Amino acid sequence: MTLTVNRLHFAYQQTPILRDISFSVPKGKLVGIVGPNGCGKSTLLKLLSGQMKAQRGEIQLKGKPLASYPMKGLARELAYLPQRPTLPAGILVEQLVQYGRHPHQGWFNQWGEEDARMVRSACERMQLESIWQQSAASLSGGQAQRAWLAMILAQDSDMVLLDEPTSALDIGHQTEVMEAIHRITAEGKTVLLVIHDLAMAARYCDELIAIGEGTIAAMGPAREVVTKDLIDRLYQTSVDILHAPGDGAPIIVPRRHEHGRTLRSAS
């Protein structure tokens, strides 16, 4: 396993946010973390990235305690992209991607041919060749996310953590970004991402971890986790689940509400 979490507990000002969280992330898989707003998804990702520290429990990366890694050493093994990262003013796409090589720099290891090769390769794999000399601020939502993902690729970490990479994107750009993330796992990287769209999660993720009220409500193969019962329970709403022709991916259809009550089918 690339990442193992054992009985993790985190509280904020005496209020429990995450309780007794345990799971493992297999190497080379795309694993999604889903759940309603405020359930602790983003907090969990910050704990796994080393941005925050849990009060109890253990996180292991490649068999070693996460806390044992020095900052740059951890960045060479694990890349973390927060939700809505801030672009530095006036930066070009190529310069943004170059930031991914920072963990590999040092007093005796300055910018070299390998760094330039990794940046070019990352831009090509994220299909940025035609825009890499543009201002990053001028990019569309989908292009901007692909630029951030290229930076992650240039970092060349085996484990990638992404916090809601498709938030605030329309369905076209969501698909564009999820296809790009899928390509990353196809290259052998392990990706753990927080994602709100359950249908997208079930279509693209290998496995899902569903969190409700700070605990794991379900986990396993993505299309087995996304069930009517789970959605009713976690999101306090009623849905119907259809299946897409061809691959059978779930299509989630919320039931209409009238005067605060869910309209139930006659059956």
Question: What are the roles of these predicted feature ranges?
Answer:
Residues 34-36:
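The feature captures the beta-strand-to-loop junction immediately N-terminal to the Walker
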Residues 234-267:
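ABC ATPase nucleotide-binding domains
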